[in-house]
Amino acid sequence: MKHTLQVIITEKELDIRVRELGQEITKKYRNSRNKMILIALLRGSFIFISDLCRRIHIEHEIDFMTTSSYGRGMLSSGDVKIIKDLDEDIYNKNVLIVEDIIDSGKTLSKVLDILKLRNPKSLSICTLLDKPECREVNINVDFIGFSILENFFIVGYGIDYAQSYRYLPNIGKVVFKK
């Protein structure tokens, strides 16, 4: 489908906000005696977590999880499958899930349920982009980079459209041509 891209968050704005998030996370966890682990939900969060982890100034581990809930279509089936599970044990650790974007919240809700069964000390969420108007599941998000109040397709900074545009240094809105 023919489309154009409109920049909605610049590279500079991303850099400033990721620094701020790193400071907020550092402040929250700096006095904890428990180990901290960041869990990136792949693939969309890979650029965000690589920048964010360097802005968190306390010792932490990093791990990755890949899930799927789409089957063959474009709409989520709600049935979350773990494609790549964690390599590290999260028992008694402060877990911070790092997400690129939260829309309906269905997949993230299932991931939370799965991780809670592994008995972390704490379980928090950091998302680069939050679309609260699209939420279908009640999820408490601890750290939000930017709220997107309109419902449109977003690309860049790790987020793709048909596996394209992940490389963009900014966040863009996909504008479909009629």
From Swiss-Prot:
Protein name stated in the entry: Hypoxanthine phosphoribosyltransferase
Keyword Ribonucleoprotein: no
GO MF entry, a single one: nucleotide binding
E.C. designation(s): 2.4.2.8
Residues that coordinate or bind IMP: E99, D103, S104, G105, K106, T107, L108, K131
Any one Gene Ontology BP term: IMP salvage
Subcellular location(s) per record: Cytoplasm
Xref: SUPFAM superfamilies: PRTase-like (SSF53271)
Broadest EC class assigned to this enzyme: transferase
GO CC, alphabetical: cytosol
One Pfam family from the record: Pribosyltran
Catalytic activity: IMP + diphosphate = hypoxanthine + 5-phospho-alpha-D-ribose 1-diphosphate; GMP + diphosphate = guanine + 5-phospho-alpha-D-ribose 1-diphosphate
Cofactor(s) needed: Mg(2+)
Annotated positions binding Mg(2+): E99, D100
Top-rank taxon, per record: Bacteria
Subunit structure of this chain's protein: Homotetramer.
This protein's UniProt keywords: Cytoplasm, Glycosyltransferase, Magnesium, Metal-binding, Nucleotide-binding, Purine salvage, Transferase
InterPro entries: HGPRT, Hxn_phspho_trans, PRibTrfase_dom, PRTase-like
Sites where the protein binds GMP: E99, D103, S104, G105, K106, T107, L108, K131, D160
Chief location bin: cytoplasm
Similarity comment text for this entry: Belongs to the purine/pyrimidine phosphoribosyltransferase family.
Pathway stated in the Swiss-Prot or TrEMBL entry: Purine metabolism; IMP biosynthesis via salvage pathway; IMP from hypoxanthine: step 1/1
Active site: D103 (proton acceptor)
Function (record text): Purine salvage pathway enzyme which catalyzes the transfer of the ribosyl-5-phosphate group from 5-phospho-alpha-D-ribose 1-diphosphate (PRPP) to the N9 position of hypoxanthine to yield IMP (inosine 5'-monophosphate). To a lesser extent, can also act on guanine leading to GMP, but shows a highly less efficient activity with xanthine.
Keyword set includes Metal-binding: yes
Binding site for diphosphate: R43, G44, R166
Organism: Buchnera aphidicola subsp. Acyrthosiphon pisum (strain APS)
